[in-house]
From Swiss-Prot:
Pfam families with a match to the protein in the record: Dus (PF01207)
Reactions catalysed, as given in the entry: a 5,6-dihydrouridine in tRNA + NAD(+) = a uridine in tRNA + NADH + H(+); a 5,6-dihydrouridine in tRNA + NADP(+) = a uridine in tRNA + NADPH + H(+)
Gene3D superfamilies: Aldolase class I, Putative flavin oxidoreducatase, domain 2
Residues the record marks as active site: 105 (proton donor)
Record bears the keyword Cell cycle: no
Family label: Belongs to the Dus family.
Organism this protein belongs to: Staphylococcus epidermidis (strain ATCC 35984 / DSM 28319 / BCRC 17069 / CCUG 31568 / BM 3577 / RP62A)
Keywords: Flavoprotein, FMN, NADP, Oxidoreductase, RNA-binding, tRNA processing, tRNA-binding
Domain of life: Bacteria
Record gene name: dus
Protein name (database record): Probable tRNA-dihydrouridine synthase
Length: 326
């Protein structure tokens, strides 16, 4: 196996969770500017598309990264072991430092086809996928949930995953059925760690679910002795979630991150065409907590280009500056 970067990380380490249509190279660089985590994962990349002669072009943008993002982990999904084997070799050649297997996506058209969290119901296939993914020599990790239907599934399922000799297991502390509709089951962390210690003490344990920031993650790590913390939706409420010394951030700083996002979108659009509409989901992250925020968000949602968005920001910030001088 190539160098296992997981073994060199600080304890606890912090990861930005892979999120579909969110954690692309643009947003990862914005987060890095605000407060960098220890590890970045890509967006979800489908193994079948990657292995298809034509499909490879459709996933290229999902696998784009730069050297300053290392250690970079490719987050991939599917259900055919031979495709994971082929893709693992290709990802190693591309310079990724690790491969993370999606066994937790709850979306119906994924899970009900036996992929993502659907693999919880197909444990033997899950094991075959894990072993096949080691072909490229990269450390293999898994992101999953407590179970599919019921929380009581967690022990048998996680025991099975721990037995596969993986580098890291990230657990979203909910079942597939629960989606994100209930509080994450932090009460199970201690028992899960005990199981890990018994079955696979060399496998790192990362916790995910309802963790808003680094400080909360540190509290959980100190309380339970877990190795890593993964933050997902918390980044939407606070782009500075990974900040080591938290402080209040001004609206100017947030709008500055939005300007950076626009510039990076423009930069990487030259390499890989990106749809401007995909930017709209990010506006609410940066435009909030200030007078006129609702109106500005509404206006930004109706823009059709980077130039239009910048013009709106220029006008809005000029008004902000004028009010502050009164």
């Amino acid at each position: 196996m190539k160098e296992n970067f997981w073994s060199t990380l600080p304890r606890p380490f912090f990861i930005l969770a892979p999120m579909e249509d969110v954690t692309d190279i643009v947003f990862r660089h914005v987060v890095s500017e605000a407060a960098r985590p220890d590890v970045f994962f890509t967006e979800f990349t489908n193994t079948e598309s990657y292995c298809h002669p034509e499909g490879i072009h459709s996933v290229r943008g999902r696998l784009t990264f730069s050297d300053d993002e290392q250690p970079m982990v490719a987050h991939i999904w599917g259900d055919k072991p031979e495709q994971f084997r082929e893709m693992s070799i290709g990802l190693a050649d591309m310079g990724f430092k690790g491969i993370d297997l999606n066994m937790g996506c709850p979306v119906a058209n994924v899970a009900k086809k036996g992929k993502g969290s659907g693999l919880i119901l197909r444990p033997e296939t899950a094991a075959e996928i894990i072993q096949a993914s080691k072909a490229g020599g990269l450390p293999v990790s898994v992101k999953t949930r407590l179970g599919y239907y019921d929380i009581d599934e967690w022990r048998d399922w996680l025991k099975h995953v721990f037995e596969q000799d993986i580098a890291n297991l990230s657990i979203h502390l909910r079942t597939r059925k629960e989606m994100s509709k209930v509080d994450a089951h932090w009460e199970l962390i201690e028992a899960i760690k005990t199981l890990r210690d018994e079955i696979a003490p060399n496998t790192l344990l990362t916790i995910n679910g309802d963790i808003p920031d680094r400080q909360t993650g540190l509290e959980l790590a100190n309380k339970y002795g877990i190795d890593g913390i993964m933050i997902g939706r918390g980044i939407f409420h606070n782009p500075f979630a990974f900040e080591k010394e938290p402080r209040e951030h001004s609206s100017k700083e947030l709008l500055g991150l939005l300007r950076l996002h626009l510039s990076l979108f423009e930069k990487y659009d030259k390499d890989e065409a990106r749809h401007f509409k995909s930017l709209r989901r990010f506006f609410k992250i940066y435009v909030r907590g200030i007078r006129g925020a609702s109106e500005l968000r509404h206006q930004l949602m109706n823009t059709q280009s980077i130039a239009e968005a910048r013009e709106l920001l220029d006008t809005f910030e000029a008004r902000m500056d004028a009010r502050s001088e009164v």
